[in-house]
């Protein structure tokens, strides 16, 4: 039996996140040398990373970091395989560390984020791979948003009380208004609009909706002369449902979101909604 103590096992677990039996086995093989045991477990963990590549990661957390002056903010999704891992402190600490890194560095895109150094000599990709190895599940970082051109606010929604936030919304206004920012972000979390405004809907999507409206109207046997008016009405209904500014405001459904913003004298410049796994 190798010469090591319970304290060595505890230390190794804290350093690697590996299970107790794996730590004991590694210490046995390393003859009680903690550093060699750490190296052995990390090598074993990296082999496990490769094995987990084909597995699905549909659980996880959305994390936000907002500057004290609301001049900037970020939203980051980190995914894992099970809600058990998502609830854990180590997973949530990893997600928070990545979000703080994004807030400090403002990477241009995901590729730049993964290649950036979150710690001296360690890229974000290596950090994620290390979490993968330590937690024993596939860990995926593939979405984030970073705003820094207005008044930025976030709303985080928990779908289950014992889980970290599963839905996150980041909004950017042209001027400070905490009440409107919060209300609109809550609306976005609940109603999941696909686009900000009518002008943001891609032309091919509009044409597809128009064709569906025309075919549906004809199938209903409506007069051909009435077709254009009916189709436009249905297309406007699509815009009302699919665009944030066209939707009835969640906190006052007698007004559209656009009307609420106009009355407050603010412009919503952009938004991002992230729901874990979707």
UniProtKB/Swiss-Prot annotation:
InterPro entries tied to this protein: EF-Ts_dimer_sf, Transl_elong_EFTs/EF1B, Transl_elong_EFTs/EF1B_dimer, Transl_elong_Ts_CS, UBA-like_sf
SUPFAM superfamilies referenced in this protein's UniProt entry, alphabetically: Elongation factor Ts (EF-Ts), dimerisation domain, UBA-like
Region of interest (Involved in Mg(2+) ion dislocation from EF-Tu), ranges: 82-85
Coiled-coil ranges (or none): none
Pfam families: EF_TS
Molecular function per GO: translation elongation factor activity
A GO CC term attached to the entry: cytoplasm
Keywords from the named record: Cytoplasm, Elongation factor, Protein biosynthesis
Location (main, coarse): cytoplasm
Localisation per UniProt entry: Cytoplasm
Function comment: Associates with the EF-Tu.GDP complex and induces the exchange of GDP to GTP. It remains bound to the aminoacyl-tRNA.EF-Tu.GTP complex up to the GTP hydrolysis stage on the ribosome.
NCBIfam families in the record: tsf
Family the entry assigns: Belongs to the EF-Ts family.
PANTHER family: ELONGATION FACTOR TS (PTHR11741), ELONGATION FACTOR TS, MITOCHONDRIAL (PTHR11741:SF0)
UniProt protein name: Elongation factor Ts
Organism: Streptomyces avermitilis (strain ATCC 31267 / DSM 46492 / JCM 5070 / NBRC 14893 / NCIMB 12804 / NRRL 8165 / MA-4680)
Encoding gene per record: tsf
